[in-house]
Design a protein with these regions (language model features):
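Small-residue-enriched flexible segments
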Residues: 1-127, 132-157, 162-185
Length: 185
C-alpha cells in the first residue's frame, strides 16, 4: 500500500474553471481567477493569510462526481505566477475548462493530521519513505517528523528512505509527481 500525504487543506470555496489554456487559469466561476484569489485573501483570517504568504497552492479535484470535496479529494499543485493583464494564475498542472479547483494552504498541523490519518490503514512491518526536502525542519518544529510517524505505524520496524525534490505516488488512483509530500510504501 502506498500513501501520499500532501499536507494541505482547502481554503475558500471550490470553483469551476470557466476559462483556461493548459496551465493558465483565466476564469473561475465566470470571473477572473485573480479576482477570486483577491477575494479569498481579503476574507481570510490572519492565520490563513500568514500561511498564504508562505505559499499558496491549488487543488484540482480528482473525482468530479463527489457531492462535496474534502482534503484528500484534490491533486495539489503550486501556483507558479500571475498574469495581472488578464487576471489569470499559472499553476503547476493543466486545468481544463470544467475542472473543479480550490485554493489550498500547507501547514504543519494539517500535514501531521494527513500523514497520521493515512498511516492508520497501513498494515506493514517495514516502510520506505520519500519525503520532500521542503518538509522536515522547514515545515515542522522537529527533525525526522515523517520518519517517526511512519516508524510508529510499522511498530518500530525498519524504515528507510530519502529526501526528494519531487515524490511519486498515487492520488485519485493515478500516479503523479508531487511536491511537498511524504510518499510512503
Amino acid at each position: 500500500l502506498t500513501v501520499v500525504s500532501q499536507g494541505c487543506r482547502p481554503v475558500g470555496e471550490p470553483y469551476i474553471v470557466t476559462d483556461s489554456e493548459t496551465n493558465l487559469v483565466r476564469g473561475l466561476g465566470m470571473r477572473p481567477a485573480l479576482e477570486r484569489l483577491g477575494e479569498l485573501v481579503d476574507d481570510a483570517d490572519e492565520e490563513t493569510k500568514a500561511l498564504m504568504a508562505r505559499g499558496l497552492h491549488v487543488g484540482i479535484v480528482v473525482d468530479e462526481s463527489a457531492d462535496e470535496f474534502r482534503r484528500g479529494d484534490f491533486l495539489v499543485r503550486g501556483i507558479l505566477g500571475a498574469d495581472h493583464g488578464v487576471g489569470a494564475i499559472r499553476i503547476g498542472d493543466r486545468a481544463p475548462i470544467g475542472t473543479t479547483l480550490q485554493f489550498h494552504v500547507r501547514d504543519a498541523e494539517t500535514a501531521t493530521e494527513d500523514l497520521e490519518s493515512l498511516l492508520r490503514v497501513v498494515d506493514a512491518d517495514a516502510a520506505l519513505v520519500f519525503t520532500c526536502n521542503g518538509r522536515g525542519h522547514r515545515l515542522f518544529s522537529e527533525a525526522d517528523h515523517d520518519a517517526r510517524r511512519v516508524s510508529d505505524a510499522v511498530g518500530g520496524g525498519p524504515v528507510a528512505g530519502m529526501f526528494c525534490a519531487g515524490e511519486i505516488g498515487p492520488v485519485g488512483g493515478e500516479n503523479h509527481v508531487h511536491g511537498f509530500t511524504a510518499s510512503t510504501l
